[in-house]
Amino acid sequence: MIFGKIDYINLLPLHIYLKKYPLPNGYKANMEYKKGVPSKLNKDLFYRRIDAAIISSIESARKKYKNLDLGICANKRVLSVLVEKNTSNAKDPSSATSNALAKVLKQDGKVIIGDKALKLYLKDPSKYIDLCAKWHEKTGLPFVFARFSCVQKKALYKQILKKFPKTKIKIPYYILQNYAKTRDLDIKDVRYYLDEVIYHKISTKEKTALKRFVKACKALNLA
């Protein structure tokens, strides 16, 4: 089993959970090996170079995928999916969902996602549009940026991950320190982002939001 890994702060709790889960060593090695940004893992899963990953939510809507109610979600604000004000339109090559979301929301400018976006927003939020905030303003709903998808063995992944949304993940200080240092962020900002902004359980409102987003994308020929 080959698992794709997105090495962003918002999935750090999941990485810690999987490291502690009693998986075969070979599986853990593969999970660490197949790293990539969302757009790369989208292609890797599509061509079955990996067996499962948290991929862009717009990509996860393909009928070929089996999905779990687990992903990257935010409500009212996300801080790490942005459009830079007063810039020319430009997609973030790391993303699929966020580029589509900017079009759905008719937000012009440069799309920026991930840890680099978080750093920029915290430095000067006035320069950026938070796309999750814009989505909530329009719909009153949360947003699902990515979703756990696989091509087979859904029951196995469901068994492995079923306790994750209910588990309080304790991230060792040295890991937080390393992530903060390598992203040029304060530890308190990393903690706030993980504790107060990002969550991973896809429930009824999140499913409603995702259906609405996919429908909007199809209307614009983005999906």
Curated annotation (Swiss-Prot):
Alphabetical list of PANTHER family matching this protein: CHORISMATE DEHYDRATASE
Pfam families attached to this UniProt entry: VitK2_biosynth
UniProt name for this protein: Chorismate dehydratase
Catalytic reaction equation(s): chorismate = 3-[(1-carboxyvinyl)-oxy]benzoate + H2O
InterPro entries given in the database record: Menaquinone_biosynth, MqnA
E.C. numbers: 4.2.1.151
Annotated organism of origin: Campylobacter jejuni subsp. jejuni serotype O:23/36 (strain 81-176)
Keywords: Lyase, Menaquinone biosynthesis
Recorded family membership: Belongs to the MqnA/MqnD family. MqnA subfamily.
Function as written in the Swiss-Prot or TrEMBL entry: Catalyzes the dehydration of chorismate into 3-[(1-carboxyvinyl)oxy]benzoate, a step in the biosynthesis of menaquinone (MK, vitamin K2).
Mutant phenotype after disruption: Cells lacking this gene do not grow on standard rich medium; however, growth of these mutants is readily rescued by the addition of aminodeoxyfutalosine, but not futalosine.
Coiled-coil spans in chain: none
Single GO term (MF): hydro-lyase activity
Biological or metabolic pathway of the protein: Quinol/quinone metabolism; menaquinone biosynthesis
Enzyme class, UniProt record, top EC level: lyase
GO biological process assignments: menaquinone biosynthetic process
